[in-house]
Design a protein with these regions (language model features):
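Basic amphipathic alpha-helical segments that dock to polyanions
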Residues: 55, 59-62
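Beta-hairpin "wing" of winged helix-turn-helix
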Residues: 63-83
Length: 128
């Protein structure tokens, strides 16, 4: 897949980063792929509020930007798996930090914390 054209008029690296990993579901997709390769339906179960269309669009953009790779197996029914590239995996400390920040925010503001949907089998530094 061909890389997307990014319009980085300001030259700001934060702007580029957010244009690549920003989006409603991209950070969650990346976070869940830290654990292991996942099939499309596994991702839809882990991100239940995302429509299949939106999930497909965000997966395509992540693939075009070189953060994930899509493996298609010649089977019936078709089997497709997604996994992080080395470049995508380099986001791990950022994604773990986002999770930790969110957990602190939830705790400080009396919000429920769902370990079930966000655990993804990824150990945080505080859990180790």
């Amino acid at each position: 897949m061909r890389p997307r054209r990014l319009d980085n008029k300001s030259g700001c690296a934060v702007e580029v980063t957010l244009s690549i990993i920003g989006g409603v579901w991209k950070p969650l997709i990346l976070f869940h792929l830290l654990e292991k390769k996942l099939r499309f339906m596994q991702l839809t179960r882990r991100i239940p509020n995302a429509t299949q269309r939106m999930l497909t669009l965000q997966l395509r953009e992540l693939e075009a930007d070189g953060l994930i790779v899509r493996h298609v197996f010649p089977e019936v029914p078709p089997k497709v798996e997604y996994e992080l590239t080395d470049y995508g995996r380099s986001l791990e400390p950022i994604l773990i930090s986002l999770r930790q920040w969110g957990e602190g925010y939830q705790r400080d503001h009396g919000m429920a914390v769902s370990q079930r949907l966000c655990a993804a089998g990824v150990e945080t530094a505080s859990a180790a």
